[in-house]
Structures are given as structure tokens and as C-alpha cells.
């Protein structure tokens, strides 16, 4: 059963946001508004926002420019890194082209070396992320890195960031997080109210919506409509409920979601950077602003952190809240931290929750679509 409303058209608008958003970016540039590009959820967006800049996620989820990237980078490197670099080098990403500053981060060794080459053709500021998040030294490092970013932004754009402006940015970003979370929490409904593909269209597409007030209002209205229609009986057929974890997913990696839903499952939740990992926790709006920002961003359960207890905690929470029947761990080829951590995730899911787990290694090509479908079909049949 499919939802017979105009909601699918709205979902498609979010899906197309990346393609159409460059017109908005051109308008922002013509109005003299600074643009800051980012690749990672660890980047504290509130800091450039407080300087009046617009933050945009840069292109990194297609194999379109990987061949060009491999002229400079190793072939056996994560496709996300090669895609990021390739889009920048070729100027095929309008968001990169119009960015006044790119903020990178040391979430993996490949990325931090890639940023050295990227800095040859674009201003790049790299934040040094601590490997651990539990000790005072790591926390002090991250607070210092946020202040260093603030100084770079202030000098780059000639705009001093006040505490009031930072608090306003925190409040606005929190409202956006809550609106997104309220939307993807619809995945907790059983039977589902909408497919995982539609959830992903909206959550991924929202990163290319730059008017945050309009985005918040649109998300709130859409969430209310979906929930109302579900309560009126417009529901999808019951199927095995799948939680996706692992590497960032969007663009070419959406083939995993399609494989799941074309073979009899529903993706009801995303624990990864595209979903709850980046959005579930807000920044405290009281107390010291830098302490509050540090608390939020150091709570991101990324595999680059050791130990990564926060990821296990969030997985447990989502398995229960989303009534999950199986977990699919998506690992991009040559992503060492997520690949190594997959054993810990498998043990946790099976031993703590007694539900099936499968790890899927993939890249941005279409060459493994058939194999993906076969493996996923067997996994779902087992459920």
C-alpha cells in the first residue's frame, strides 16, 4: 500500500533540493552573504551561523568525479573522500564553487591528508578532533578548536561573533534539529507511515534548504500531515523493520535502502550521520556556550572515536523505540574505522538485543546492485 496524497510530491521536492539549491546559493552570493561548506556533522554550524554565514553540505555522495580524483588520490581510498575531492577539483559542485570557506575535520586519516590538497584551490580550515571524548584534555582540545574556528570565521568575514549571536544561532539550529527529529521519529509508527526512502529524501534534502525558518515550518506541517493520515488509517503494509547504521548514506549509497525495500523490508530508522547521530541531541541553551557546544558535538557516536560507547547507546535506544527486526550496517569500501567497529556492533546487536545483523560493504558504483539485492533478500527472508 502507498500513501495516496500529495505528500510524495513534497518528498520529491526535498529529494531534488540538492539539484535546485544552487540557484538559491547564487542569490545568496549576489546579496553578499558568506557561504561555509562542510562535509561532517562534527562541524559546529552555530559558529559560522552566528557570523551571518550560511552553512551548506558539500557534494560527496556520487562516483561522478571519482575518476578525476584518482589522478591525485589512491584508488583504494574511501569513495566519500574521493568524491569530495573530485567535486571540488572539477568545480562540478556549485556549493563548493560558491563557498568562501570549507571547514574540514580530522575524522579519518584519508580525509585530513585530502584536505591538504584541497587547500591548494580553496580556503580550508581543518578542525583537530580528539580521538577520545571522555577525558578533560580531549574536551579542552575541542573547546580550543571551536575558538580557533570562530577566530578564522571572524577574520575571514570581518564579523565579530558576540555571545548573543551565538546563543541565537544555537536556538535556531536546535529548532531545526527538533523539527527533523520529529519527522524521522515517524519511523517509530507501526505499521509504518512512510517508507525509508521517503524519510531519507527529506532528511538528506533538508541539508540543502538554506532558509531555516521556512524549513522548520515545512517539516512541522509535513510531520503533522503524515501523522494525521496514519491515525486515519493510511498505513503501509507490515514488513520486517530495518535500522540502518554505519557510514553516511545519501546519493549513490541510497541503493542499499532500495535493495531493502524492494525485497520486502521497510527502513524505519537511520542511526548514521544522515539521521539520528547528527540530530538527536540538541545544544544546551543555558550555561557557557562553548561548554554546551562541546557537550553536544563530543556526544556524536562516530567510529573515529575510541571507545565509541555513544554509538552503542544510541543503537540500543533506536532498536527499542523503532521496534527493529534487523540491523543493516553500511560500510563504505576502505573506511577502516567503521569496518573494524562492525564486530563490536554485531556483538552488541545480537547479544544485547537478540536480533539479526548484517554488514554490507559497498561504494558509489552500480556494479554491486545485483549482489546487494541477493544478500539483502536472503537477510530479510530470514527475518
Curated annotation (Swiss-Prot):
InterPro entries: FldB/FldC_alpha/beta, YjiM-like
EC number: 4.-.-.-
Keyword terms, alphabetized: Lyase
Nucleus among keywords: no
Top EC class of this enzyme: lyase
Keyword Transmembrane (UniProt): no
Top-level taxon in the UniProt lineage: Bacteria
Gene Ontology molecular-function annotations: lyase activity
GO process annotations (BP): DNA damage response
Coiled coil: none
Protein name as annotated: Putative dehydratase subunit YjiM
Similarity comment: family membership: Belongs to the FldB/FldC dehydratase alpha/beta subunit family.
